């Protein structure tokens, strides 16, 4: 029993010694990197005065740009009609999250970074840290929701267009904010290592409890990062496949268009022959109305030689047929038909001198009926194909631009937040890792910069947002 008790006491002493060493190491890191600098303002600073002034200016500009940019995004969606669509409510939610970061989190962080000590009390510290976790988590989860929305819209556009209702979007946004609250609230409920009493030199920092660090970093960053990586890769593959399918469809339609042009020539030749015969019969009906002495003369003038319908084209038909041709024909066929019209008009002018106006009226009433095509012309089909292809091209261009914008947003998100969350996850398990306050402040503000960069990304890569921003800022488009 005595040996057992001695063994237990030895283990307890070792544990206490280890904890004391860890605390001493942390305190040593804090003391070694905690110099104070006097200033002309009568307060001590964590950095030299010139550095404090420069830091304050830079960080204040970041805060102002974050506030202004995200307010412009919110106003653009609600005031500019092309942006007033359901899926843009995700962007509004993201802008609200970034705006709360700029208003509730960043100003206190500026003061804390420059002063090097927390002077606002323990309760403000707890609320500030909770808002920090919740708002940053909401910003990241909103990016994840936007990625999922784009993924469903591209991979299943028909079904998802019916499912993407305002209620569904608002439900997803609500889930994002509820999850953010769940991830950020445990420290307020006791899952923390905060001191009970704050001294002037007591740091206000995120809890380093290993369990909470793993829980919060996974929910706030690592799980959304995995989801966005997989989703964006699927979006890339789906967009690439659709572009490849469109290229194949374009080749097929080009070949089909060429075949239609060839068939159009044959059909035109056959229709001319039928029209010639029909017009010949009509001309015979016309010649019965005149006297027998003029019958042979009129028959010679009205009887077609090669293409008789060209000789029965009055001047009044010129404008009428020119209005029809651009609709029924493509660019190449307009030139050919234009030449035929010139020949027909010339022939009409020469024949109108030798025939009576009444005869022309009677012939003109019958000729258009005989030359009318009951089936749609191949040129009409080609125009329809071109219209559909153009609509598909515009749609795919928008999808590709949206996917590219999403990829840039995700890339900026990773660059901004990955350093912070790597350090945040490593520190609780590495007591001997001494990091300077300047480095910690840098990676923390690098993450905050993500809230300022999102509106800039929209402005650069989205034409509608650019127009809306210019309209809100009273700039000429």
Swiss-Prot record:
Gene Ontology cellular component terms for the protein in this record: plasma membrane
Cytoplasmic side: 79-88, 149-168, 239-405, 461-477
Alphabetized GO MF terms: octopamine receptor activity
Keywords: Cell membrane, G-protein coupled receptor, Glycoprotein, Membrane, Receptor, Transducer, Transmembrane, Transmembrane helix
Regions of compositional bias (Basic and acidic residues) in chain numbering: 263-272, 279-295
Family annotation (PROSITE patterns): G_PROTEIN_RECEP_F1_1 (PS00237), G_PROTEIN_RECEP_F1_2 (PS50262)
The keyword NAD is annotated on this UniProt entry: no
Family: Belongs to the G-protein coupled receptor 1 family.
Name of the protein in question: Octopamine receptor
Species assigned in the record: Heliothis virescens (Tobacco budworm moth)
